[in-house]
Amino acid sequence: MIESNLLVLTLVIPILTAILLIFIGKRPIIKRYVALVGTLLTLVIALINLKNVLRDGPIKVELGSWKAPYSIVFVVDIFSALLIITSIIITILVILYSYRSIGLDRERHYYYFSIMFMLIGIIGSFTTGDIFNLFVFFEVFLMSSYCLLVIGTTKIQLQETIKYILVNVVSSSFFVMGVAVLYSVVGTLNLAHISERLSQLSVHDSGLVNIVFILFIFVFATKAGVFPMYVWLPGAYYAPPVAIITFFGALLTKVGVYAIARTLSLFFNNTVSFSHYVILFLALLTIIFGCIGAIAYYDTKKIILYNIMIAVGVILVGIAMMNESGMTGAIYYTLHDMLVKASLFLLIGVMYKITKTTDLRHFGGLIKGYPILGWTFFIAALSLAGIPPFSGFYGKFYIVRATFEKGFYLSGIIVLLSSLIVLYSVIRIFLKGFFGEVEGYTLSKKVNVKYLTTIAVASTVITVIFGLSADTLFPIIKDGAETFVDPSQYIHSVLGGK
């Protein structure tokens, strides 16, 4: 009972924090600390939840005094617990970074409120046990993201927000259609119950299941920024301030990735044989087009944004394999990418603060005035590229191993080659931005970026610790992968369990 209450608290605390932020009014200093304390409390509860999951297996809570599959169910397993903890850590870093970067005008209004509600939507998406509430939590974090995109009301923000809203309204409509078709086939919305019902379907209903798969893959691939539904991502994520880009780039696409992994495991593991091939095909195209974008631009933000696409593609290759190696690599690489992308965006934000530009052709020589910033970026770049012993190596190694175990040798080779493109793209930023002639800033008039650099360095240190802790983490992550490869444990914990 206590464990169930703790699971609910990961949603209740951010909700109460958001409500309190409304009543505080236009007092940004107080809002800063309320948002920070609320997020720290949520992190403590999330860590306790992880400890309970490691001890007892997946934990569920049923709301409304009804039993599953008729109740509203929230479930946390190892993967969702790790995603929640990582999301909260990144939220804390973004809040701290915002103190000196986002501006008092934004802070006075609904900035921290929107961050809290986006965190609610993300945590809810990772823990909900039914498909309709997944839609609800998607809408919660999407509406919060709309608010964050327009805060500041610059022309480019408004332009990109309109596109972003349009794309997501269309995908949300398809989501509702998919839920309706699925319910007409199986008569339930509970994820675990849907899995059981789909395994009992006759061949006659397989056509409708194919339609459901197409609808869901369109929706989740759009959220994750998968080719060809990625077109909104570079513009929408480029427009807002760096603190918001960090929040979006590190977290939002991973919600779509998680939804693909969970539904593929529960709904389509055995029912739709071509589903894994479709996801693999889209994943490889996403990697290829992400690589093209990463080397085509001189803008530092766009280079990292296209690296988001590459990472999403690599993760989906592991998910498409749906074996122990593939899912272990996908889980580890997802957590790694969330942390390292946050680090890189925060570092680029510091570089922008100094030079007032993100165009590599217009600045250089930063290492002379800001050596700590430069070498921290170098470490984050190596981690992103997957150079051992940093965290990017281990997840990618398991994903490539999974492709070879399944006989998808070309897929494994594409993943390996993408590492070279990633390394080239980020080392280009390092060499052009930090070496060469001093340009874009005055060496004798250094900009005070100590606070922002400290937050960015802290973020990178967390990434490095994550990589160096691989031996400790992998047994845990392998247990989390088993829930996807063999979802019976998840199903039992929801329908038969605790």
Curated annotation (Swiss-Prot):
Location within or outside the cell: Cell membrane
Task of the protein: Mnh complex is a Na(+)/H(+) antiporter involved in Na(+) excretion.
Sequence similarity: Belongs to the CPA3 antiporters (TC 2.A.63) subunit D family.
Gene Ontology molecular-function annotations: antiporter activity; NADH dehydrogenase (ubiquinone) activity
Protein name as catalogued: Na(+)/H(+) antiporter subunit D1
GO biological process: ATP synthesis coupled electron transport; sodium ion transport
Domain of life of the organism encoding this protein: Bacteria
Membrane topology recorded in Swiss-Prot or TrEMBL: Multi-pass membrane protein
Keywords: Antiport, Cell membrane, Hydrogen ion transport, Ion transport, Membrane, Sodium, Sodium transport, Transmembrane, Transmembrane helix, Transport
Pfam families for the chain: Proton_antipo_M
Organism: Staphylococcus epidermidis (strain ATCC 12228 / FDA PCI 1200)
InterPro entries named among the record's database cross-references: CPA3_Na-H_Antiporter_D (IPR050586), NADH_UbQ_OxRdtase (IPR003918), ND/Mrp_TM (IPR001750)
GO CC, alphabetical: plasma membrane
Protein encoded by which gene: mnhD1
